[in-house]
């Protein structure tokens, strides 16, 4: 019997019953298997032209960088500064996107003979983006041209007060506010009237386009050096891995093993991603889980300039030292993160906000470098918008993570009268606020969220490609999926479901026993299945028959074998409810109870015999109607009766706990 307490997820099977079984011949011409072809067609790649772009587009297929609004003006000013030997400073951000953006332009400008430096604010004391003190200091150091990367789009007021003699170019990819900075140039594909066709570039992608434009203008050559850094930053910033981002990431990762960027090479080795047997790096999650956290650790715990130093040094010895240092810093970050996560959970209980539609969690002197990660971990538990703030000297600095149904940037904008500063995207943002305004902010944000979110929005959805028998999950099948790489946002790794899998063995694994491993029958074979971070609850027991959702992988340990990374699991005999089933039950129920109340046993018996409903599903359906107050139960002479009730408001099935728990995916 399966244990209780696991998180409920909704499984959305993308393969519909009416899905065409015929695979167009052009897929075979490109050596695409039928299984992969079905996945690609579901993702809209249903013509040979679309497939060819997906499989073969390279750096030569990138758009003309001068299509980007502001590019011509920005490049003209940069080239003038280079020719006149002006001091140029690249002003970046402290995350991986900011570090790689800064490194791309520093390496490019140095290569063109520029007198260039860089500046990245300290996360802990300066916060995100431009600040007045930094601008004044940079001007005193003799800089006459400042170019931002991955920041600046929301700094119109500050730029209007810039020091005399300091020109500014803004390059960014964040959502532009109504008022744009008045400066030499604003380069951001999201700004109005920007004709650049691809809008989803990360900050490093925009910086890479600036580098291309500089060389096209000066040398007439399309410059593609440093695309490795664009790949790293694009993956780390979790932007869409489609179109030009897919090109940057795929082409950049191809160069990882032969890169001339000493810091990147050293970090690949120090992180364990590259060793003597490594033949290629094709999976984006190797970067997102292996490289990005280590580079991010610099900006979170130490100073992000260490990351830029690593990616711009020409010394192999310095590169090895800095890479090792970042790995040590990452270990420190992990411990700080664990401590704050535990404190945040206690704070949620203390505030009694577990049922809030948006969780606003504040703590005194929490390390600002890890609150974004903590917010992400809390979101995984509660599946609703999470805002984590650290309070120091009367000011709270917050990091936000959201769910697809809730635009957190718009939510912050709606409360901007309470905020000192804010910025970000639909799914992630940052802000600052006076500490005494946090309770009012929590109250207003929850009212805003409650008006826009339904209970259904707060239940995670697993987008499952299709249901497969385990016997179909072969090593060859898994290798065929590699053509999808790089996978990430908008091009996810495919996950699959299987039904009626028999659990042969089940046990805890790992030093802290937080993980779980079982073996599932697949015909004559046994397949290993792993559950990461299950906590105190065993997902299943030996002897269970289960349905599960999994990501397949080839595990290389004494040879290749199939392993499943499990995402969710259900007992095979769970009786699940669908909207159609409930509508059918309700129609027959209203006829049966039209004139008068009837005994519960009589209602159930008649609906089973006349309606053909299975007993357990029928019982669950009737329980849903009771929870929604469409049906009431009362006793008369020791017998239970049902009475129909008239709905007085628009009904939402997700308000029923029984439906949420047992609904059909």
Predicted regions, residues:
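Hydrophobic helix-and-loop "lid/oligomerization" segment in the mid-to-C-terminal part
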Residues: 16-144, 164-165, 215-440, 467
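Generic detector of well-ordered alpha-helical packing
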Residues: 94-98, 151, 173-174, 189, ...
């Amino acid at each position: 019997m399966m244990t209780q307490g696991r998180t409920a997820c909704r499984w959305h099977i993308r393969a519909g019953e009416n899905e065409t079984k015929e695979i167009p011949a052009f897929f075979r011409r490109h050596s695409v298997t039928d299984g992969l072809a079905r996945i690609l067609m579901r993702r809209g790649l249903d013509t040979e032209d679309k497939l060819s772009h997906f499989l073969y587009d390279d750096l030569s297929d990138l758009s003309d960088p001068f299509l980007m609004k502001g590019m011509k003006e920005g490049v003209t000013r940069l080239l003038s500064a280079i020719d006149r030997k002006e001091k140029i400073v690249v002003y970046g951000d402290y995350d991986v996107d900011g570090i790689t953006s800064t490194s791309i332009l520093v390496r490019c400008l140095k290569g063109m003979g520029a007198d260039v430096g860089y500046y990245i604010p300290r996360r802990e004391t300066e916060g995100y983006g431009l600040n007045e003190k930094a601008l004044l200091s940079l001007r005193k150091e003799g800089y006459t041209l400042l170019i931002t990367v991955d920041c600046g789009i929301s700094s119109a007021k500050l730029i209007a007060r810039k020091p005399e003699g300091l020109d500014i170019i803004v390059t960014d990819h964040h959502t532009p506010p109504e008022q744009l900075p008045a400066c030499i140039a604003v380069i951001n594909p999201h700004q109005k009237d920007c004709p650049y066709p691809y809008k989803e570039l990360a900050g490093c992608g925009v910086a890479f386009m600036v580098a291309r434009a500089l060389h096209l203008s000066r040398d007439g050559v399309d410059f593609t050096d440093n695309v490795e850094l664009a790949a790293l930053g694009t993956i780390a910033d979790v932007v869409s891995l489609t179109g030009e981002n897919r090109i940057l990431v795929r082409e950049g990762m191809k160069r990882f093993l032969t890169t001339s960027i000493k810091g990147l090479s050293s970090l690949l080795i120090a992180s364990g991603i590259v060793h003597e047997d490594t033949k290629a790096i094709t999976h984006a999650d190797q970067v997102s889980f292996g490289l990005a956290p280590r580079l991010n650790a610099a900006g979170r715990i130490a100073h992000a300039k260490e990351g830029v130093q690593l990616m711009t040094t020409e010394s192999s010895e310095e590169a090895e030292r800095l890479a090792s240092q970042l790995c040590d810093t990452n270990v420190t970050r992990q411990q700080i993160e664990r401590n704050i996560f535990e404190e945040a959970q206690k704070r949620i209980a203390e505030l009694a906000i577990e049922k809030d539609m948006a969780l606003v969690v504040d703590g005194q002197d929490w390390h600002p470098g890890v609150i974004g990660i903590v917010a992400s971990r809390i979101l995984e538990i509660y599946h609703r918008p999470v805002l984590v703030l650290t309070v120091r000297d009367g000011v709270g600095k917050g990091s936000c993570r959201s769910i697809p149904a809730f635009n957190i940037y718009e939510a912050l904008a709606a409360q901007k009268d309470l905020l000192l500063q804010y910025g970000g995207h639909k799914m992630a943002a940052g802000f600052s606020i006076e500490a005494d305004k946090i309770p009012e902010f929590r109250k207003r944000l929850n009212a805003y969220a409650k008006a826009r979110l339904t209970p259904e929005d707060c239940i995670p959805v697993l987008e499952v490609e299709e249901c497969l028998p385990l016997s179909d999950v072969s090593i060859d099948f898994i290798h065929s999926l590699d053509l999808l790489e790089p996978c990430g946002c908008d091009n996810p790794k495919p996950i699959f479901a299987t039904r009626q899998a028999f659990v042969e063995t089940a046990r805890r694994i790992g030093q802290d026993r937080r993980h779980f491993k079982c073996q599932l029958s697949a015909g004559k074979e046994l397949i290993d299945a792993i559950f990461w971070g299950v906590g105190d609850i065993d997902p299943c027991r030996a002897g269970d028959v289960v349905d599960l959702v999994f990501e397949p992988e080839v595990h290389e340990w004494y040879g290749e074998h199939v392993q499943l990374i499990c995402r969710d699991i259900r007992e095979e005999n769970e009786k699940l409810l669908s909207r159609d089933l409930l509508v059918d039950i309700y129609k027959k129920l209203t006829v049966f109870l039209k004139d008068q109340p009837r005994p519960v046993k009589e209602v159930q018996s008649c609906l089973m015999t006349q309606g053909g409903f299975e007993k357990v599903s029928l019982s669950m359906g009737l329980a849903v109607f009771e929870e929604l107050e469409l049906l009431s139960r009362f006793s008369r002479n020791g017998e239970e009766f049902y009475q129909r009730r008239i709905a007085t408001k628009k009904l939402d099935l997700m308000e029923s706990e029984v439906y949420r728990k047992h609904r059909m995916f």
